[in-house]
Each structure stands twice: as structure tokens, then as C-alpha cells.
């Protein structure tokens, strides 16, 4: 989903800014997003509170003004960039914007990879212990963000759902898992249960039926 408005910018003292080798890729990233309509270039204010309403024109001077603003720097407190609703903090003295609404920008270091999804029904041993847990394993996806939704007979299920945070695998792709905890009666009272995984706009759904497992 495209952001309605957005900013990539940075106000930082020259001595704290990135060197020329870091500037060019980040500047080109910002200009590419502008060219593809993913980002409306905005000028970061020189002082005071962030003002998302100041737009940058197409003049040469405006493009020059973008030079020092189309930059992204990692937060010194964290290993990876983090977004907040009002922008992106790097050094204490500098405020960098990443889309006005806090949308995360991922710079891909490798090709995208769709997840492999496997859905396991409750085991017979677990059912005998008066429990029923469905396990949805999600592996080999990149970048490392997925959304998981559970359904019973096509209707959303919210209660009893626990999803882990994606973790990096040895192949630099990501894996996660999601669990749906039920009672044996709940498990047997529906025709089917589904685990729906959405990654980068594509959805993979796996379904299991209690009758197939009896």
C-alpha cells in the first residue's frame, strides 16, 4: 500500500553525516522512490518541530537541498534502523524522516523469497491429554516480515493464537511459527482449520481437516 505522504530526510551536522560512499546510494534510493511515486519529497525543517507540509519542487536548487536530506542512518542504540510515528532518529542532534506515518523501508540485500508454510494438526498423544494445538511452520522467507491469520471453516480465529517473531536462519532467510491452542472439542467441531501467511503482498494458505486426521 502506497503512503499518502512521505519523507526521507536528515538534518545532521556535517561531521556526523555519512561519507561520500554512503551518500550516493542513499540519495539515489530516495530519488528512485520519488520517481516511482512511492515517496513525495519533503524538506526537513531547519529548526523547530517537524513540518510534513513543506514540499520540495523540481528546481535545481530544490534538488540540491535534497542532498543533505535524502539520507538514512542507523540509530546508535540499535543494530538496525527503527521507525517511529514522527520519524527516524539517528544521532541526538539529527532527525531523519522515513515516511511520515512511520512506514518501514527495507533495503534488500538479497532476492525476495516466498515462505514455505507447513501446517500440523494436533497429535493423537496431545488429544489424549485433552489438548489440541495446531502448529504452522513458516520458513525460508525474505525479507523477514510476515502476517499470520488463522481461520476455522473460513471464519477468522483470534483467541488462542501465538505467533513468534521471525528469526534469521543459517541461509540468511527467516523463519517463524504460529500456534493455535484449542480444546479437543473445538478441534473436532469444525470442518477445517487454515493458517494464512501473507508476505510481501502474496498469501500462502494451508488447511487441515479433523476428519483427515482421525
Curated annotation (Swiss-Prot):
Question: Which GO-annotated molecular functions does the record name?
Answer: antigen binding
Where expressed (tissues)? Contrary to IGLL1, not expressed in pre-B-cells.
Q: Where is this region: J region?
A: 98-109
Q: Where is this region: C region?
A: 110-214
What span is annotated as the signal peptide, if there is one? Answer: 1-35
**Where does the Ig-like C1-type domain lie?**
115-209
GO terms for cellular component: extracellular exosome; IgG immunoglobulin complex
Q: Which cysteines are joined by disulfide bonds?
A: 136-195
State the compartments where it is located.
Secreted
**Where is coiled-coil annotated?**
none
Quote the InterPro entries the UniProt record gives.
Ig-like_dom, Ig-like_dom_sf, Ig-like_fold, Ig/MHC_CS, Ig_C1-set, MHC/Immunoglobulin
| A biological-process GO annotation | immunoglobulin mediated immune response
Keyword tags: Disulfide bond, Immunoglobulin domain, Secreted, Signal
Instruction: Give the free-text miscellaneous remark of the entry.
Output: Located within the immunoglobulin lambda locus, but does not require somatic rearrangement for expression.
- PANTHER family for the chain: IG-LIKE DOMAIN-CONTAINING PROTEIN, MHC CLASS II-RELATED
Name listed for the protein in its UniProt record: Immunoglobulin lambda-like polypeptide 5
Organism name: Homo sapiens
UniProt lists the gene as IGLL5
Amino acid at each position: 500500500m502506497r503512503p499518502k505522504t512521505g519523507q526521507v530526510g536528515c538534518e545532521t551536522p556535517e561531521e556526523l553525516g555519512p561519507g561520500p560512499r554512503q551518500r550516493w546510494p542513499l540519495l539515489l534510493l530516495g530519488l528512485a522512490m520519488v520517481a516511482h511515486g512511492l515517496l513525495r519529497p519533503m524538506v526537513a525543517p531547519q529548526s523547530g518541530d517537524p513540518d510534513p507540509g513543506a514540499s520540495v519542487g523540481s528546481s535545481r536548487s530544490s534538488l540540491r537541498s535534497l542532498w543533505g536530506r535524502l539520507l538514512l542512518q542507523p540509530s546508535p542504540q540499535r543494530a538496525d534502523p527503527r521507525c517511529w510515528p514522527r520519524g527516524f532518529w539517528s544521532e541526538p542532534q539529527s532527525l531523519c524522516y522515513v515516511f511520515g506515518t512511520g512506514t518501514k523501508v527495507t533495503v534488500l540485500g538479497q532476492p525476495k523469497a516466498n515462505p514455505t508454510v507447513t501446517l500440523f494438526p494436533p497429535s493423537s498423544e496431545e488429544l489424549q491429554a485433552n489438548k489440541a494445538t495446531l502448529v504452522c511452520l513458516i520458513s525460508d522467507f525474505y525479507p523477514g516480515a510476515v502476517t499470520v491469520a488463522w481461520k476455522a471453516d473460513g471464519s477468522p480465529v483470534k483467541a488462542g493464537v501465538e505467533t513468534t517473531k521471525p528469526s534469521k536462519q543459517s541461509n540468511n532467510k527467516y523463519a517463524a511459527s504460529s500456534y493455535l491452542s484449542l480444546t479437543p472439542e473445538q478441534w473436532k467441531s469444525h470442518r477445517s482449520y487454515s493458517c494464512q501467511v501473507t508476505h510481501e503482498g502474496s498469501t500462502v494458505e494451508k488447511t487441515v481437516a479433523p476428519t483427515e486426521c482421525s
